From Swiss-Prot:
This is Small ribosomal subunit protein uS12. InterPro entries: NA-bd_OB-fold, Ribosomal_uS12, Ribosomal_uS12_bac. The modification 3-methylthioaspartic acid is found at residue 89. Residues 108-118 have a biased composition (Basic residues). It comes from the Bacteria. One of its GO terms (molecular function) is tRNA binding. GO terms for cellular component: small ribosomal subunit. Keywords: Methylation, Ribonucleoprotein, Ribosomal protein, RNA-binding, rRNA-binding, tRNA-binding. Part of the 30S ribosomal subunit. Contacts proteins S8 and S17. May interact with IF1 in the 30S initiation complex. HAMAP family: Ribosomal_uS12_B (MF_00403_B). Belongs to the universal ribosomal protein uS12 family.
Length: 124
């Protein structure tokens, strides 16, 4: 434990908090343009074809973003909204595309957790 004199001389050093989403530059979301839409395989022990897109953000940084939900309408030059949030079994994927905003359509026939996937309430 330091003495008061040592604290007067040096002071306490603040902990450096490292951001998990540097490409968003402090924003909650960023707009971007898809440069490539493709599928990739997750790391062991999982097996699938995960849908991802390379997105050039308005902050000038190009990132890999995951496309959540079943089916999508994205292609090259689509305008998308990107939020933070990693995909645990895809190394290097630290962002997700927001469904139901800009050029991205919501998930069809979605009954539960609709707001996460941009799905409208079904007419009963």
């Amino acid at each position: 434990m330091p003495t008061i004199q040592q604290l007067v001389r040096k002071g306490r050093e603040d902990k450096v908090v490292k951001t998990k989403t540097p490409a968003l530059k402090g924003s909650p979301q960023r707009r971007g343009v898809c440069t490539r839409v493709y599928t990739t395989t997750p790391k062991k022990p999982n097996s699938a074809l995960r849908k991802v897109a390379r997105v050039k953000l308005t902050s000038g940084i190009e990132v890999t973003a995951y496309i959540p939900g079943v089916g999508h309408n994205l292609q090259e030059h689509s305008m998308v909204l990107v939020r933070g949030g990693r995909v645990k079994d895809l190394p290097g994927v630290r962002y997700k595309i927001v469904r139901g905003s800009l050029d991205t359509q919501g998930v069809k026939n979605r009954k539960q957790a609709r707001s996460r996937y941009g799905a409208k309430k079904e007419k009963s």
